[in-house]
């Protein structure tokens, strides 16, 4: 994770500090997501919530790891304050608008949920032909991805999405 993130602002000013490096910030955003509302209103019941990036149909999936933290905006606000962002912060969420089912709608719904805890999000929904090159150039602070394990093994999405970037070593 980078020390600086290109599209993050605190009190209206660009910051050199990347708030996403703090686990409390990431947990706050996670706990501010009302997954049941996303499932009902955005996905119209055609989704299966999961607490991990590994699908339940994939070797290596763990029911324990798939448990989600509860939706709790008050806990999220407290975590942000503890992390040094009592008034929240701003960032741009880049997402495709023609790659995943309801991708842009999900991005907008997340922005609305995060606004309730003081985090202002600009949703930059763009065609996938522009989105993926932007993300691969590291010209994004936060992006949306979906991933399937064509090998049916958890290693594939974990290595592709979670592995630390080490370009000189040729991985990440």
Model-found features: residue ranges?
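Extracytoplasmic/periplasmic ligand-capture domains
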Residues: 1-42, 48, 58-172
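Extracytoplasmic/secretory soluble proteins
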Residues: 51-53
